[in-house]
């Protein structure tokens, strides 16, 4: 009886051997993947070997060969200079650990921007080879580098810091700077570069957490009627930034810090409070260079986010890579592949949004430039000179692909008469038409030529009555107009782009319209009117906005044609500008407006 109990309770020799072998294997695997490459290497001088630098980086990342995407950004920066700080190495740092070594990482500050280097475990003489790019409006600029010792549980210990003044453009070369501590030096290579206007950040390698929605911010204050979410309470992001996805996961450092990942249209954020050690990572989507499948400890599927060169870490020391970029690795997802696709989709949507905004900014800049030159008198449309040898290609004023036909009929006037009578600078037709619609605060700029477009352009502003229940009583509207008359004066094209400002989703769309008149005989022409809605960004109510805008413009066309015919009739009776068949001057019938 006793012998049977002993056999049941005590393990056999074979079970002991299996347990010991498994323990040794797990310990060896942990040290192999967690501490491979972390040694106490000596730095003798400035010109250290780059191959040694690569060997000292934390490279325990078993990447899947199926790399998911290589992401590039091309946003714009308005900074005058870019200061590139290359953190090369440090030596003779204070030993903060019991074994006389440290786990150093650096925090680099320039103005209000803060970036984290990777952590080099178990070394008083770390090598980094990492670059940090900071935009600045002017020189001199102050660069502060503080070396910390990473602690798994407690707050990091400061090992020393140094502040460098960047006085002028140019590169300093590798220079050792003494820290404000009993021992320790850091080697930096600083290069200040003057940027051309609107230099792409793909060149500067810098997107940053603070650069957000320039076009939206310029529209005025945003009122958000909702409770602050985790992005506001934890990460102090803007009130209108909301969580699109959130995932339970863990951040890999010395071990896995479990927390939660939040994904918005602009950032990937992570928060952990293990051992009451607050860890907050805020990665701007514009700083992401690659998103890869990876593994943690061979058996735990993970996702590695690699940041572009010069971006640096955000909030927590990242992991290093041999090419100088830094990365964050997240593991312990419920569904790694599902999360990976969501992150990839968020980054793609971000860059697509930037491309759309960049095109719209360029288009708006062209219109603003075209409207900045003022002229006077009637519309002066010159016949094009003989440029067969050097053909000129003008830009399209509107998006033709969004237009739909709403009116086609015979109009009792010639294209030249419409240009000289209705659209001339001294004409009061636009004032009468806007008065008939009860619009107010009308301001009409004179016609002038524009290098970007054929013919002439002008800008008008007014406040328009809103009939939609979703809109306020009235809204400010900016309308850009473009007109061109063919050399034989038989075809007139009149195009408009309307931008409402105060309606819901007003910044998301524009109303494009084209009037085309082709001479039929000496007193009439065939008129074709097309209208459409161009969406600069996707929005939920796209179809409803499009249908409402087209219906509203159909009503406008009735009033515009009625006022136009009345104005032409009164003008023909009081001037000798041209003979108009008065019997043909009748109001447009609603049946013609489809």
Curated annotation (Swiss-Prot):
Composition bias, Polar residues: 584-594
Start and end residues of each GRAM domain: 231-295
Residue ranges of the TM segments: 8-28
Compartments, record wording: Membrane
Induction trigger: Up-regulated by cold, drought, salinity, abscisic acid and fungal infection.
UniProt cross-references to PROSITE patterns, sorted A to Z: C2, VAST
One Pfam entry name: GRAM
Statement: the UniProt record of this protein carries the keyword Transmembrane helix: yes
Start and end residues of each VASt domain: 399-572
Its membrane topology: Single-pass membrane protein
Swiss-Prot/TrEMBL keywords: Membrane, Transmembrane, Transmembrane helix
Top-rank taxon: Eukaryota
Keyword Membrane appears in the UniProt entry: yes
Span list, region Disordered: 571-594
Function according to Swiss-Prot or TrEMBL: Involved in proteolytic processing of BAG6.
PANTHER family per the UniProt record, alphabetical: BAG-ASSOCIATED GRAM PROTEIN 1 (PTHR47038:SF1)
Protein name per UniProt: BAG-associated GRAM protein 1
Organism whose genome encodes this protein: Arabidopsis thaliana
